[in-house]
């Protein structure tokens, strides 16, 4: 599926090309100009009610241009951070104006969207994805996300297995990210990096995925009540064993 939006992660790219058939001597391209606009209308070329975007870095991201005698291409790289905090995505127009060898010119405009990074949410031990369904529904109802931008991944069938098994054998996070990227692409969003939220064991699995499998596709990680340094009950055990041994060896007079 062709994407027209990209997630704000500083890496995802889309290309727009104005092209003519090879051998078309009337339209030999010598150079091009690129501009960006906010516009909500039917004809950007004749309508003066458009806003030129000057803050390229934060709204558009970055871009490079390339042209041959029959093509003019702009490659866009998404901004590193999401510019709008209240919408699921925003859009702008990129306008390519190609100049021809014969002195003429032609322009094309393409709508491009910038989306929030997709979010994968992992539940904890002895739990299921149903725990975070109300949270997902709240975020979607707020208008800040669309449903495809959030995946509440369920791994209840394996979450009593070891961290290693869930990371490497069952590939909980890896498969979840694949599902999330497909969900995004199905609604026209190209993506490279993703936000991860994990509760308890879910946070550990996301951290282990980054440490042991792949850390090139993570935008940010947020963990909730995750025992990264082990469960606190582990600190109680040595003292508990000491008391048990002490009382077991104590003289009956002290019991």
Listing of model-derived features with the role each one plays in the protein:
Residues 1-114:
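Beta-strand-enriched, solvent-exposed domains that form extended recognition/catalytic surfaces
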Residues 14-16, 120, 204:
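Hydrophobic beta-strand residues of extracellular immunoglobulin-like
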Residues 115-194, 239:
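Active-site catalytic motif of lipid deacylating hydrolases and related acyltransferases
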Residues 133, 206-211:
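Short, hydrophobic alpha-helix immediately C-terminal to the catalytic nucleophile
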Residues 149-152, 206, 229:
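Short, well-structured secondary-structure segments
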Residues 174, 178, 191, 210-255:
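Helical cap/lid subdomain of alpha/beta-hydrolase-fold lipid enzymes
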Residues 187-190, 201-205, 213-214:
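Extracytoplasmic/secreted proteins and extracellular or luminal domains
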Residues 197-202, 206, 225:
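Gly/Ala-rich beta-loop-alpha elbow adjacent to hydrolase catalytic centers
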